[in-house]
Amino acid sequence: MIRRPPRSTLDRSSAASDVYKRQGDNVRDSTLYVTLEPCCHFGRTPPCTEAIINSGIAKVFIAVEDPDGRVSGKGVEQLRKAGIEVVLGPGKEETKVDLEAHIKLSETGLPFVTAKFAMSLDGKIASSSGESKWITSEESRMVSHAMRLESDAIMVGVNTVLVDDPRLTARLENRNVDRQPLRVIIDSDGRIPVNSSMLSEDGSTFVATARNVRFSDRIKNLSTRAFPDKKGKVDLISVLEYLGKIPVSSVFVEGGSEILGSLFDQGLVDKVAAFISPSIIGGTDSLVAVGGIGAKFMSDKYVLTGVKR
């Protein structure tokens, strides 16, 4: 293995270029295995196909054709025209899962959305007083941090910021984190406190509002934009479309209940990461994991597939 796959769209670079840079003529007449079709256009790096052709590699196994319109079979065509044997499809289904965010972004222009929540056995994410630390275990939180690190962005609603004052960073034991995900705050009226803990952390924060709001210029790495819907709330579809153009390919949504409910109501959730504690909180005033309108009939409920523990 020359290198591992990239963890996000924001830091994706060419594995094929790495092969040529690190190995030079040592790879001549060898076989290359890649998960995604090599790119054939100029971006942050030169075309991957150019590096492969120049390296003298004789055969390339490609698991998945890149649905990105700039590639979409053209990379394979360039390699074959250069006399390189190309084999498509080995490991395709497994690889499509690994590349699910890139595939969705390329096909729809929208990021892949993972809804994450930690709840009690009766579906509560906080007590009636609003207390939520901690429902699940330290081990669960470490898994959550690893999932943050794999994401381009972390999204929460402003109520989560006001109640919990989260740092919204990826923190792993015994490992330096060189890139923090973009923090996305859904905040209709611009209520995020300027002394929020996250604003002093590494990385950038983006506040999506429903009206034009100006924050202090002294706050570093903070940007904002209005996405009003007809009800005076933040238009979540417009936010996701905007993020997709950055490009942000994956969004890890950590609540709260209102944001998760809105995303489910609009059919914007692609994956669910539920951490369930063997505990009961109870109470009609305790927050449930997913708010919103919800399913009126059982036939309207979300049914999850590919469930893993």
Give the location of each predicted region.
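Enzymes that bind and transform nitrogen-containing heteroaromatic metabolites
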Residues: 44, 112-309
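Single conserved hydrophobic/aromatic residue that forms the stacking wall/gate
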Residues: 1-16, 20
